[in-house]
């Protein structure tokens, strides 16, 4: 009997339909913006989230790091939860790539609240402390065990960002799960954030890839940052086709994943060596 691997949603493999989409994909040189499958994915995701433009990246960490680079200058500071992926699981990229420090905040299950933002912003005219320029939130939260933000809470944080002149980035590696679990309208996300990264290789089952969405001016600059980080790809439409198939055909099935995870949690709850993340 084959084992069931529940270590992570990153161990997913392409379905038969996804493999067929990959093998039949039309491709070109994406560095020249001539890969029709990449272009189709980018256009679809931008429209899906109500954003102006999107850009395909090989990994989520690269997309997040590009966003941080776009929104900050060396010596500045971003605000994030102490459990955030951008701080804990991206190899120190915030400091290495952007020369930026992190103001880390607490909060239940990896979630920030709007009332935490103002006290965390350094006085802009006090040159002894780094200038605060960016807030990063994560939905769903990785170390928080899949906790989801209410859309109104994200809007409240966004309002604080506007008040203090801060950029607002969403690490949405598992945003697909939040959309299904909370029955949220994805088109409300694009106008709310300066940038959003969404991963295709977890619950959606694609082999690789993340898409960064935002305003056209930001995404145009993101192309240069992606190049600097080594993310330019050629005939990558085979992978982009897998991601587009996952969104169009497998997104709704995340609800089944959630149901099964809940059933498994109930079975494990009686074991004294298993701890709930909720």
PLM segments and residue spans:
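Conserved PLP-enzyme active-site core in the AAT-like
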Residues: 1-278
């Amino acid at each position: 009997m084959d084992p069931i691997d529940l270590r992570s949603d990153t161990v997913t493999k392409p379905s038969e339909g996804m493999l067929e989409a990959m093998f039949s994909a039309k491709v070109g040189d994406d560095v020249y913006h001539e890969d029709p499958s990449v272009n189709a994915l980018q256009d679809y995701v931008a429209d899906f989230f109500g954003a102006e433009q999107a850009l395909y990246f090989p990994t989520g960490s690269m997309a997040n790091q590009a966003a941080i680079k776009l929104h900050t200058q060396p010596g500045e500071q971003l605000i994030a939860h102490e459990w955030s992926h951008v701080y804990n699981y991206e190899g120190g990229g915030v400091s290495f790539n952007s020369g930026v420090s992190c103001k880390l905040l607490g909060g239940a299950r990896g979630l920030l609240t709007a009332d935490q933002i103002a006290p965390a912003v350094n006085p802009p005219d006090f040159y002894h402390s780094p200038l605060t320029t960016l807030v990063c939130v994560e939905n769903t939260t990785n170390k928080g065990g899949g906790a989801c933000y209410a859309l109104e809470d994200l809007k409240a944080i966004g309002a604080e960002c506007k008040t203090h002149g801060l950029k607002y980035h969403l690490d949405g590696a598992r945003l697909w799960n939040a959309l299904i679990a909370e029955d949220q309208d994805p088109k409300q996300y694009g106008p709310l954030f300066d940038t959003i990264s969404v991963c295709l290789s977890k619950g959606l089952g694609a082999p690789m890839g993340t898409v960064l969405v935002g305003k056209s001016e930001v995404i145009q600059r993101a192309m240069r940052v992606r190049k600097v980080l080594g993310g330019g790809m050629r005939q990558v439409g085979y992978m982009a086709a897998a991601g587009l198939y996952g969104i169009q055909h497998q997104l709704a099935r995340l609800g089944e994943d959630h149901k099964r995870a809940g059933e498994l949690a109930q079975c494990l709850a009686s074991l004294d060596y298993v701890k709930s993340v909720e």
